[in-house]
Structures are given as C-alpha cells and as structure tokens.
C-alpha cells in the first residue's frame, strides 16, 4: 500500500503524464519528485552524432523538465513539495570526451537554480543532487554510450574515456545505499543546500574547480573591468 511501480519513459510525454496520473490515483499527491533518469555519452565534440546528442538531452534535461511541469500544479495547490534533480560532478568540471554529457547536467543544474527561486515563495523546495563516482551500473550496458563516428586524431586524448576502456569499474568509493539515506535525511531538514555534492572526492574536485575559477577571475579582473564606461560617462 505504500509503494507503486509504474512504467515511465522520460522521452515520452504520454508516458510521463500516465505515470504521474497513476501516482495521483493511488496516493492522491506527490510530495517528492526525484529526477534520477539519465545516461552517459562519451565523444569528442566533433565526433558527436546529433541524433544521439538530442536523445541524451531529451533524457537528461527535457524529460526532467516535463516531469517537473507535470507535478507542479498539485504542489502549488498544496503549497508544499520537493523537487530533487540529480546531476553529476561533471556539471562542475567537464572532462575530455564528456562535453555533451556534462553540458546536459550543467543545464539541469542552472535550471534548478532558477527553479528554486521561483518556487520558494510557494512553499516548494528544489535542490540539485550532484554525485561523484559511485559504485553503480553506470559503466555497464546502456548506461554509458559512445559515439560511433570516432575520429583518429582524438584517440590519444579521448580514447581512454570511451565505453569499454575503463579500468576501475565497480571500484568507485561512493556507496549508493549511503547516498540514498543521506538524500532522505537532507530532505527532512528544512535547511536544504542549493547543491548537495555527494562523495569526498567530489567535494575536493568542486573546491579545486571553484578555486581555479576565482584565480582566473582575479587574473583577468582588470581586463574585464576595462569594458565598463568610465565614471561620469
């Protein structure tokens, strides 16, 4: 009586609408939406197959948007609810071969950043969940795909990132069960972070990335400021 399994294809608007309706018919409400569907795509930018990239974005970005839009009317009516969008450490720091995947996750993060400000006055909360490397099936089967249009000039740089070339599968430090518990615990806390980064290595990576960005801003601050009108103009 407390669980309901439904079929949901985030690339299908009809599937999304039907799944949400089934949940409402069963429980009367949806208090928490977790957008966790997604997969990886490894490719140098030039190698990217546009249809594959469009499907990636449909799964990682547009599908979650459709789900958000499907649950918000009821959440607005009840003046409560939580929307958790799962992204990736890649959204903070893209790697070679991950530009398309990272950009889809970064787009979801920035969308959530705006969404949380729009929903706060309505009593609804939104948060980004940004996991690092976790011991899941991400590197197995269809969870990680790669371009079929490989270009030899990129092999030395991108080759190691291609599906099938990973040496540390199922040795990641992140424990998915612990991550799930942390997410549940945080949702029960009124003081939600904008971004909940998961994993010690992920926190270190984000800090390093932010420090590098600050250093770059400082280095180029004078050049950046030179574009402003002179005082009095």
Positions of PLM-derived features:
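A glycine-rich helix->loop->beta "capping" turn
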Residues: 1, 22-33, 41
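A short, exposed helix-loop element centered on a Lys and neighboring polar residues
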Residues: 68-69, 113
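Active-site helix of classical SDR
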Residues: 68, 104-107
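SDR active-site lid
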Residues: 121-193
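The beta1-alpha1 cofactor-binding region of Rossmann-like NAD(H)/NADP(H)-dependent oxidoreductases
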Residues: 8-18, 50
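Substrate-binding pocket helix/loop in short-chain dehydrogenase/reductase
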Residues: 44-45, 49-54
């Amino acid at each position: 009586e407390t669980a309901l399994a439904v079929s949901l294809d985030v690339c299908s608007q009809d599937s999304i609408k039907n799944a949400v309706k089934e949940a409402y018919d069963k429980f009367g409400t949806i208090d928490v939406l977790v957008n966790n569907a997604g997969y990886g795509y490894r490719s140098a930018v030039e190698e990217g197959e546009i249809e594959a990239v469009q499907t990636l974005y449909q799964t990682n970005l547009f599908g979650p948007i459709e789900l958000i839009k499907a649950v918000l009317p009821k959440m607005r009516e009840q003046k409560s609810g939580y929307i958790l969008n799962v992204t990736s450490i890649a959204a903070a720091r893209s790697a070679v071969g991950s530009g398309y995947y990272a950009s889809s996750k970064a787009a979801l993060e920035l969308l959530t950043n705006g969404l949380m400000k729009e929903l706060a006055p309505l009593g609804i909360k939104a948060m980004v969940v940004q996991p690092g490397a976790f011991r899941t099936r991400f590197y197995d089967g269809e969870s990680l795909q790669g371009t079929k249009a490989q270009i030899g000039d990129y092999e030395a740089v991108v080759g190691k990132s291609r599906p099938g070339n990973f040496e540390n599968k199922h040795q990641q430090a992140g424990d998915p069960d612990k991550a799930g518990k942390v997410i549940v615990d945080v949702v029960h806390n009124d003081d939600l972070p904008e971004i909940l980064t998961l994993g010690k290595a992920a926190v270190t990576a984000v800090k390093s990335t932010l420090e590098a960005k600050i250093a770059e801003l400082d280095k180029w601050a004078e050049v950046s400021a030179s574009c402003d009108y002179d005082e009095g103009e």
